[in-house]
């Protein structure tokens, strides 16, 4: 899980979703998991 100021989709499997006001990226590739904070 990377914590970043700006989250971007890295590959085509990445999905940007918002959970409880937190922007997250979920992906089948574990390295691509990110959240904004």
Curated annotation (Swiss-Prot):
**Which PROSITE patterns does UniProt cross-reference here?**
RIBOSOMAL_L36
**GO cellular component terms given for this protein:** cytoplasm; ribonucleoprotein complex; ribosome
- Answer yes or no on keyword Signal: no
Q: Which GO terms describe its molecular function?
A: structural constituent of ribosome
Pfam families for the chain: Ribosomal_L36
Task: Name the protein family.
Answer: Belongs to the bacterial ribosomal protein bL36 family.
Query: HAMAP family, alphabetically?
Result: Ribosomal_bL36 (MF_00251)
Q: What is this protein called?
A: Large ribosomal subunit protein bL36B
Native source organism of the sequence: Aeromonas salmonicida (strain A449)
Gene from which this protein is expressed:
rpmJ2
């Amino acid at each position: 899980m990377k914590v970043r100021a700006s989250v971007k989709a890295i590959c085509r499997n990445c999905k940007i979703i918002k959970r409880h006001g937190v922007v997250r990226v979920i992906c089948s590739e574990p390295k691509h998991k990110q959240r904004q904070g």
